[in-house]
Curated annotation (Swiss-Prot):
It comes from Cuscuta reflexa. It is found in: Plastid. Belongs to the bacterial ribosomal protein bL33 family. One of its GO terms (biological process) is translation. This is Large ribosomal subunit protein bL33c. The lineage of its organism: Eukaryota, Viridiplantae, Streptophyta, Embryophyta, Tracheophyta. Keywords: Plastid, Ribonucleoprotein, Ribosomal protein.
Length: 68
């Protein structure tokens, strides 16, 4: 019996609003909110996007998958 390739991969979700507005009024970088999760490659071949809480923005924002 042939071995199957590992279907689950680890992905990083990054806040899209923090990535666009990384510099605040004083020109100091505030950082970017990131979450680490897993996805099934066969069920979801395209990039993931979730609404998750961003502690930097203090609200629920869209978090998108980024490359490692």
């Amino acid at each position: 019996m042939a071995k199957t390739k590992n279907v689950r991969v680890t992905v990083i979700l990054e806040c899209t609003s923090c990535a666009q507005n990384n510099v605040n009024v004083n020109k100091v970088a505030t950082g970017i909110s990131r979450y680490i999760t897993q996805k099934n490659r066969h069920n979801t071949p395209n990039r993931l996007e979730f609404k998750k809480f961003c502690p930097r923005c203090y609200k629920h924002t869209l978090h998108g998958e980024i490359k490692k």
